[in-house]
Amino acid sequence: MEVAAKLSGARLSAQKARLVADQIRGKGVEDALDILAFSTKKGAQIIKKVLESAIANAEHNEGADVDELKVKTIFVDEGVSLKRIKPRAKGRADRITKRTCHITVKVADK
């Protein structure tokens, strides 16, 4: 049994989210939640909410036991980039790219 949860358009770059995702891939959900709870990265709190959603989906929809779940797959894809302009000196402007990402977490029985 495999259950997924997805967050689209998270205001976080995919590169920074992948640093956190790599830490919990393949771990049990209890260990993964502990790692995310004590991480200082912004992406850790976002990924933690997605993981908690996947766990809740497994409990509610499939009747799974939380102690038996592990993070089977987690991947981060790039989302749309928001283009913004930052005014500079002498009438010039620089482009700022505010990146987003899509986070997918799949949990399964051990």
Curated annotation (Swiss-Prot):
Q: Which GO terms describe its molecular function?
A: rRNA binding; structural constituent of ribosome
One GO cellular component term of this record is: cytosolic large ribosomal subunit
Q: Give the UniProt keywords, A-Z.
A: Ribonucleoprotein, Ribosomal protein, RNA-binding, rRNA-binding
Q: In terms of domain of life, where is this protein from? A: Bacteria
Q: Which PROSITE patterns match?
A: RIBOSOMAL_L22
The yes or no answer to whether the keyword Ribonucleoprotein is present is yes
Keyword presence, Transmembrane helix:
no
Q: Name one GO biological process term.
A: translation
Subunit comment: Part of the 50S ribosomal subunit.
Q: What does the record give as the function of this protein?
A: This protein binds specifically to 23S rRNA; its binding is stimulated by other ribosomal proteins, e.g. L4, L17, and L20. It is important during the early stages of 50S assembly. It makes multiple contacts with different domains of the 23S rRNA in the assembled 50S subunit and ribosome.
**Protein name per UniProt:** Large ribosomal subunit protein uL22
Provide the species name: Cellvibrio japonicus (strain Ueda107)
Taxonomic classification, please? Bacteria, Pseudomonadati, Pseudomonadota, Gammaproteobacteria, Cellvibrionales
Which gene produces this protein? rplV
